[in-house]
């Protein structure tokens, strides 16, 4: 199998996010970035499939500025064979990212193209399906179990109230959900080896995109609640507060 894994660099999920000076992007000063957690499932699935087959190649792709090299090195440390950074300036929208990825993947001869189900910074769930559409490939999203046999995949995806089982032929695009596997941690040996693995940087000029961010702001602080008492004796005070302060009565 020849497998591509498409990755994104996102702020650490425990980091405190604040708007930047321009109020249209986040302030990255002192902010820690990590490999998108859902993409870890995609990396692990690629590695496990190669190990099970006993042969093949795994390639990681990312679209973004030079700082994305660190994210790709994380995938290389986990065991990915080589990586490609489609280097861009700014923050292209999902469609521009999908077009850039599709342009690179089209001639790669990949049997399987893996994405995380979503990126935790924007929750759009767009890029994987758009790449599939641009490449005219079948796509199964939010996959929690995957089987490959005889040139076809059988995928389980959790839906509200049950599990949907989908079959399609290879090549295919799969977006990976929690439960698909348990991502490995990079070992020291892998971290050292990652420094010597190929990481190709391909400068690219993307379009302006069709989405404009007008502004970012933090949610307004809410006033803390108040406990007015318990039982029937608290009802008059509660009614008074609802009428005089909350003004909902």
Q: Which sequence ranges carry the predicted segments?
A:
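N-terminal glycine-rich FAD/FM-binding segment characteristic of electron-transfer flavoproteins
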Residues: 1-249
């Amino acid at each position: 199998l020849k497998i591509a894994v498409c990755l994104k660099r996102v702020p650490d999920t425990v980091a405190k996010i604040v708007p930047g000076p321009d109020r249209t992007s986040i302030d990255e000063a002192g902010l820690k970035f990590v490999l998108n957690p859902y993409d870890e499932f995609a990396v692990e699935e690629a590695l496990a499939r190669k190990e099970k087959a006993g042969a093949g190649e795994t390639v990681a792709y990312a679209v973004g500025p030079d700082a994305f090299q660190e994210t790709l090195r994380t995938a290389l440390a986990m065991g990915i064979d080589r990586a490609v950074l489609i280097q861009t300036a700014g923050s292209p929208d999902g469609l521009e990212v999908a077009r850039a990825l599709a342009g690179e993947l089209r001639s790669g001869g990949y049997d399987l193209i893996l994405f995380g189900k979503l990126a935790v910074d924007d929750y759009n769930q767009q890029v994987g399906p758009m790449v599939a559409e641009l490449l005219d490939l079948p796509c199964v999203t939010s996959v929690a179990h995957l089987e490959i046999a005889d040139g076809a995949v059988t995928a389980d995806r959790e839906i509200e109230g049950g599990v949907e089982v989908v079959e399609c032929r290879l090549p295919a695009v799969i977006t990976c959900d929690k439960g698909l596997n348990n991502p490995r941690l990079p070992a020291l040996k892998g971290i050292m080896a990652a420094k010597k693995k190929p990481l190709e940087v391909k400068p690219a000029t993307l379009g302006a995109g069709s989405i404009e961010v007008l502004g970012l702001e933090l949610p307004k602080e809410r006033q803390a609640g108040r406990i007015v008492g318990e039982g029937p004796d608290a009802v008059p005070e509660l009614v008074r507060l609802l009428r005089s302060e909350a003004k909902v009565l």
